[in-house]
Amino acid sequence: MSHQLTFADSEFSSKRRQTRKEIFLSRMEQILPWQNMVEVIEPFYPKAGNGRRPYPLETMLRIHCMQHWYNLSDGAMEDALYEIASMRLFARLSLDSALPDRTTIMNFRHLLEQHQLARQLFKTINRWLAEAGVMMTQGTLVDATIIEAPSSTKNKEQQRDPEMHQTKKGNQWHFGMKAHIGVDAKSGLTHSLVTTAANEHDLNQLGNLLHGEEQFVSADAGYQGAPQREELAEVDVDWLIAERPGKVRTLKQHPRKNKTAINIEYMKASIRAKVEHPFRIIKRQFGFVKARYKGLLKNDNQLAMLFTLANLFRADQMIRQWERSH
């Protein structure tokens, strides 16, 4: 397939001012280890035969990444390839040849879902980051967030997604699923991910979020009682778990007397703060606020891809911070 630019594309690429989208895509172009990612998918990707020749695997992977960065449906991604030159160039496509349609884009996503390849990409990228010395093992921060799912029954099946559930947080009811993550305390990179229905208690998945080499685990008050859990009895770590809000309020009524205890809570909170970074990236930077698909498997595939890309985005942030300070 030709990567030659059309007249319109070349005119676009020679513009002086770079847009925010161009700058972002340029950074992602450099930080993503494309060959490592392609090697994960290649054994499952259709080979050129007698029928219609498939698009290059890396092109489809680049399109898939852009779908997650910009929270685009298959149809919206197809439109973007026609309308936005910077996205077309990033995918190594040109208007002088056919562009992938929404069905082709959807089929690539289904391929990743069918073989759980987003999970494999998550592991591959984390191994690559660990080998690069970015991901450490000393401490793990754990947290969970509720992700809303459409609660309407006005669909083909006339029912809500049976794999999603309702749960109450504070005074509000939520319907959907929950993403549980284990995060490297040093870098803020996500090393573990578990997807469940929203009504799953955070503590139930704690053991699945630990890699086994950490010396301490930090968590909010929702994880109180973790050291007493039978399945965590063999876990030899320092537990830095926040006290319940009511107890903290009581301590603050006598600040002088409880100064040490209050300072310990502040210390726990400062250590724990980095666990919010991955959620902030996927929600605010990538715009992911609601489950797009039906069923936990498809949504787990999307979340695994989102956290893979969030780790690479975070690694890029760390590199740029280092460059500014040197």
Swiss-Prot record:
<dbReference type="InterPro" id="IPR008490">
    <property type="entry name" value="Transposase_InsH_N"/>
</dbReference>
<dbReference type="InterPro" id="IPR002559">
    <property type="entry name" value="Transposase_11"/>
</dbReference>
<keyword id="KW-0815">Transposition</keyword>
<dbReference type="GO" id="GO:0005829">
    <property type="term" value="C:cytosol"/>
</dbReference>
<dbReference type="GO" id="GO:0006313">
    <property type="term" value="P:DNA transposition"/>
</dbReference>
<dbReference type="Pfam" id="PF05598">
    <property type="entry name" value="DUF772"/>
</dbReference>
<comment type="function">
    <text>Involved in the transposition of the insertion sequence IS5.</text>
</comment>
<dbReference type="GO" id="GO:0004803">
    <property type="term" value="F:transposase activity"/>
</dbReference>
<dbReference type="Pfam" id="PF01609">
    <property type="entry name" value="DDE_Tnp_1"/>
</dbReference>
<dbReference type="GO" id="GO:0003677">
    <property type="term" value="F:DNA binding"/>
</dbReference>
<comment type="similarity">
    <text>Belongs to the transposase 11 family.</text>
</comment>
<protein>
    <recommendedName>
        <fullName>Transposase InsH for insertion sequence element IS5H</fullName>
    </recommendedName>
</protein>
<dbReference type="InterPro" id="IPR047959">
    <property type="entry name" value="Transpos_IS5"/>
</dbReference>
<keyword id="KW-0814">Transposable element</keyword>
<keyword id="KW-0233">DNA recombination</keyword>
<keyword id="KW-0238">DNA-binding</keyword>
